[in-house]
Amino acid sequence: MELISTINLLTIVLLLFVVSKIWKACWILLLRPLMLSKRFKKQGISGPKYKILYGNLSEIKKMKKEADLCVLDPNSNDIFPRVFPQYHQWMSQYGDTFLFWTGTKPTIYISNHELAKQVLSSKFGFTIIPVKRPEVFILFGKGLSFIQGDDWIRHRRILNPAFSMDRLKAMTQPMGDCTLRIFEEWRKQRRNGEVLIKIEISKEFHKLTADIIATTAFGSSYAEGIELCRSQTELEKYYISSLTNVFIPGTQYLPTPTNLKLWELHKKVKNSIKRIIDSRLKSKCKTYGYGDDLLGVMLTAAKSNEYERKMRMDEIIEECKNFYYAGQGTTSILLTWTTMLLSLHQGWQEKLREEVFNECGKDKIPDTDTFSKLKLMNMVLMESLRLYGPVIKISREATQDMKVGHLEIPKGTSIIIPLLKMHRDKAIWGEDAEQFNPLRFENGISQATIHPNALLPFSIGPRACIAKNFAMVEAKTVLTMILQQFQLSLSPEYKHTPVDHFDLFPQYGLPVMLHPLG
């Protein structure tokens, strides 16, 4: 009798467990999405229909695949429908603010400038979207871009001095040396008797910026920087291919062919970083310690006894991954699209070259004092960031029920802010919003539009990019030196195919023709 009672009790417990799991699954997969859809509909927000488990991922995948086949006119800057075909289609159906589903995750698309500013400027209530895919940390590192709360405050405080203007002033010479080194490689590609040099410049900029970040931030060699860059580029391919797939927790531990390759590449990246760190630890100087570059600042923090100024070695490795990847990607993309624009607009290229010759001569490596005099160059870079900014959208998540303008946003809702679209808003930028017109920045960013915070290439608010000044100094250094030594033109083989590869990337690269000057 006792045995039967025990069995009955276990059966009831098991049944309750199974029922609770079924209820939870029903809630996550069906009931919650239906409830939230109705809640948003009452606010006048609709969107594509939710599909169980997948949400709208299948539709996104299909639309992106079709858009990737489209080749645009090189003179057209109307790239939003190609880069984000899903947002373009849904905006035409549901308006400027709509709801869609990333799996079971509700996501609100907000392209209103004032609402976007409120979300990005908020210190409480919105945070970066929690990462569930393990390949994200393998690629980017669990560094400043992804940590939150007190850890983020501590890391930001420690890392800020590495990007001070005094430090940046000292970086222009090594940036220039790296640039001269790659110029020599370009000249070697010229065949006998040929005047022009044909190169795929987006790859070259990726290699150059990897060398610059390795040299200026980590004091590592060219070979070490390129090897690390190569491994991270391979990791990036796996990350991009996974974005439209549903992630099933636990699958990251299975020895699948993809996971095995990810583990192998991750090991290579970590070993490369450890070698760079070990080399710096061995070369510590009694006078200057570990140095005042990014790696030196972090290693100094590792020895601190104050928690607010201390970093663990595992945190340093993660920040190295983060800055190596972000440090090369942002500037290389900015340089790539600026080169395309100057190749198309030869008049502006000549204006910039004349300004460079007047302020910097024909062979001098520029410094930060020179940059303040290059007004036209700054205008061109601002316009390039507007039309082809590396960061094309920003994601946030509501950590509690929030009210933004007229919108009531439930806890756990993701928010997409489409910078690529907002930077082309004719209501803000005027009827020529799709046109390349650097003169709109003649009186500065704040006077370029009716909205003072309309240009957001590096975000805004507490989580604005820590290295934005580094990126701009790097871009100005490289661009100045290119204009000193080469005339730029597009190769006839170029296909205008901007694509969302986390950054805004040319799908088939950017082949250009370089004509050496002098």
Swiss-Prot record:
Signal peptide: none
EC assignment: 1.14.-.-
Tissue specificity statement from the Swiss-Prot or TrEMBL entry: Highly expressed in rosette leaves and siliques, and at lower levels in flowers.
Transmembrane segments: 3-23
SUPFAM superfamilies: Cytochrome P450
Subcellular locations according to the entry: Membrane
Reported cofactor(s): heme
UniProt superkingdom: Eukaryota
One Pfam family named in its UniProt record: p450
Consequences of knocking out this gene: No visible phenotype under normal growth conditions, but mutant plants show increased sensitivity to abscisic acid (ABA) treatment or salt stress.
CDD domains: CYP709 (cd20641)
MF terms (GO), sorted A to Z: heme binding; iron ion binding; monooxygenase activity; oxidoreductase activity, acting on paired donors, with incorporation or reduction of molecular oxygen
GO biological process, one term: response to salt stress
Function according to Swiss-Prot or TrEMBL: Plays a role in abscisic acid (ABA) and salt stress response. May regulate the salt stress response independently of well-characterized pathways. Does not function as cytokinin hydroxylase in yeast heterologous system.
Family recorded in the similarity comment: Belongs to the cytochrome P450 family.
Designated name of the protein: Cytochrome P450 709B3
